[in-house]
């Protein structure tokens, strides 16, 4: 099978392998995109566009409640009253329980895409870049991250909206339209280097350093409510501070990971980044 691997240490590419694939081809990041979502949330809070990670999302994107029975991705998936209290922190930490009746916000770790879509739409709406009446008309969350993150770190990635093949009554304009990034391994390495340096790029603070520190440890919601084997996720990152996900690796390591073997593994104590991205 084709594969691409890049190792960077001390700010330089140490090794790069490209087997039966073009190193310049951009690959879909799938859920690895969610770590960039996290960074953009940190930026939005720093800029005062969003007040706090603990703000109710309905105050910014009330449309999230406009999904009745028969309008969700499946028959039993709909917005229910407790969803009104969902916070930004719960969305990025996959503990929101969005459209999952029986899951109270902040109590259950359930890795899902639709809650992340609510996150990106709510942030983009706060910047006046997304509307459910015409989802593809505005600049969108992807363009926002180009402005705030990609361009400052001299990246070259692109993005597009992605949707699952759902039934015709599904309100995808509310909970669909996933912002999917396409990156080369070197783009992925740029993201990793930004995170390793706590959001700083050549002296410019692109993402708040405190946010990176905060997002790359297992969230308190998971620590307080889930068994130890689930103590693996922070705010948009897979985290090893509890030693559960990679027991033999340094506790300060963390990663962005997505389907198709898209991975950006970061280890600050080793000043090391490892990227895997099949072509």
Annotate each predicted stretch with a short phrase.
Residues 28, 47-98, 128-178:
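Active-site helix/loop module of the DD-peptidase/beta-lactamase fold
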Residues 22-24, 101-105, 116-117, 124, ...:
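Flexible glycine/proline-enriched surface loops and loop-helix/loop-strand junctions
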Residues 115-122, 179-200, 262-278:
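Active-site-proximal alpha-helical segments within enzyme catalytic domains
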Residues 11, 28-53, 119-123, 188-191, ...:
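Active-site SXXK
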Residues 162-165, 217-273:
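Active-site Gly/Thr loop motif
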Residues 25-29, 80, 103-111, 174-182, ...:
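Solvent-exposed loop and edge beta-strand segments that line ligand/cofactor-binding
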Residues 1-22, 264-265, 271-275:
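A short, well-structured edge-of-sheet supersecondary motif
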Residues 160-223:
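Flexible, glycine-rich surface segments
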């Amino acid at each position: 099978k084709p594969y691409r691997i890049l190792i960077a240490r001390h700010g330089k590419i140490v090794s790069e392998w490209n087997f039966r694939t073009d190193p310049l081809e951009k690959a879909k990041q799938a859920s690895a995109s969610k770590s960039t979502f996290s960074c953009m949330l940190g930026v939005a809070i720093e800029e005062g566009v969003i007040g706090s990670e603990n703000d109710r999302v309905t105050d910014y994107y009330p449309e999230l409640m406009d999904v009745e029975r028969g309008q969700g991705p499946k028959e039993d998936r709909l917005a229910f009253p407790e969803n009104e209290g969902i916070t930004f922190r719960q969305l990025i930490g996959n503990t929101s329980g969005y459209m999952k009746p029986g899951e109270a916000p902040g109590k259950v770790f359930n890795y899902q895409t639709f809650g992340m879509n609510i996150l990106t739409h709510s942030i983009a709406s706060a910047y006046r870049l997304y509307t459910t009446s015409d989802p593809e008309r505005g600049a969108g969350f992807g363009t926002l991250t180009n402005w705030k993150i990609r361009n400052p770190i001299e990246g070259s990635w692109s993005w597009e909206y992605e949707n699952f093949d759902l039934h015709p009554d599904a309100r995808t304009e509310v909970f669909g339209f996933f912002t999917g990034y396409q990156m080369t391994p070197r783009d992925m390495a740029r993201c990793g280097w930004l995170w390793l340096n706590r959001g700083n790029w050549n002296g410019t603070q692109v993402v708040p350093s405190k946010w990176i520190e905060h997002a790359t440890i297992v969230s308190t919601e998971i620590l307080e409510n889930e068994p130890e084997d689930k103590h693996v996720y922070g705010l948009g990152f897979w985290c090893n501070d509890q030693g559960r996900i990679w027991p033999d690796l340094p506790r300060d390591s963390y990663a962005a990971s997505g389907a198709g073997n898209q991975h950006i593994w970061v280890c600050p104590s080793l000043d090391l980044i490892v990227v895997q991205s099949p072509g």
